Amino acid sequence: MRRPGAVVRRAGGYVTNLMPTAAGDPIGGGLGDQVYNRLLGERIIFLGQAVDDDIANKITAQLLLLASDPDKDIYLYINSPGGSITAGMAIYDTMQYIKNDVVTIAMGMAASMGQFLLSAGTPGKRFALPNAEILIHQPSAGLAGSASDIKIHAERLLHTKKRMAELTAFHTGQTVEQVTRDSDRDRWFDPVEAKEYGLIDDIMPTAAGMPGGGGTGAA
């Protein structure tokens, strides 16, 4: 079953795209452990799956760990179809909480909560690779239960929609009304359109153009 808000676009339709080995502690260990530990040593965090509580706990822990050196940037690479709002908000709040600049880089796709985290990077340090795709849309959830429960959940969803629109407006420079209109249905952006809208600050074909080389040492 698809997680609320998580989408992946491919030829022929929408499919699930999960990568449970992202952000450390890969299943089975071995080479995957070495790769993600090496990335973390370079201050790189990778979100390469739908956002859920497990990945949010890992990423927030990594952000807090890297925040021990507050003068160095942290690099968050994003290839995500979106996912849980509450899990994503845990990552978002931690990004705002720490003193470090958080450089965000979209690769592949940053959709829904993936887009939200991308746009929440430090102003001037939000990037996309040339062929990334970015999606904004309103929060969604399946509602079930008694009429009273459905009413409570619907009211909460409207509150969440309003809050997400306010924060997206803050990070993009758009008005809340504009964001609300644009996210009423799926709206896809290529990197040029995303830059014009304020979702990102620049398009980077190579790591050499990013602050600190994007954590790759290419600068």
Curated annotation (Swiss-Prot):
One of its GO terms (molecular function) is ATP-dependent peptidase activity. It catalyses: Hydrolysis of proteins to small peptides in the presence of ATP and magnesium. alpha-casein is the usual test substrate. In the absence of ATP, only oligopeptides shorter than five residues are hydrolyzed (such as succinyl-Leu-Tyr-|-NHMec, and Leu-Tyr-Leu-|-Tyr-Trp, in which cleavage of the -Tyr-|-Leu- and -Tyr-|-Trp bonds also occurs). It is an enzyme of class 3 (hydrolase). GO terms for biological process: protein quality control for misfolded or incompletely synthesized proteins. One of its GO terms (cellular component) is endopeptidase Clp complex. Keywords: Cytoplasm, Hydrolase, Protease, Serine protease. InterPro entries: ClpP, ClpP/crotonase-like_dom_sf, ClpP/TepA, ClpP_His_AS. Fourteen ClpP subunits assemble into 2 heptameric rings which stack back to back to give a disk-like structure with a central cavity, resembling the structure of eukaryotic proteasomes. Belongs to the peptidase S14 family. Cleaves peptides in various proteins in a process that requires ATP hydrolysis. Has a chymotrypsin-like activity. Plays a major role in the degradation of misfolded proteins. This is ATP-dependent Clp protease proteolytic subunit 3. It comes from Streptomyces avermitilis (strain ATCC 31267 / DSM 46492 / JCM 5070 / NBRC 14893 / NCIMB 12804 / NRRL 8165 / MA-4680). The lineage of its organism: Bacteria, Bacillati, Actinomycetota, Actinomycetes, Kitasatosporales.
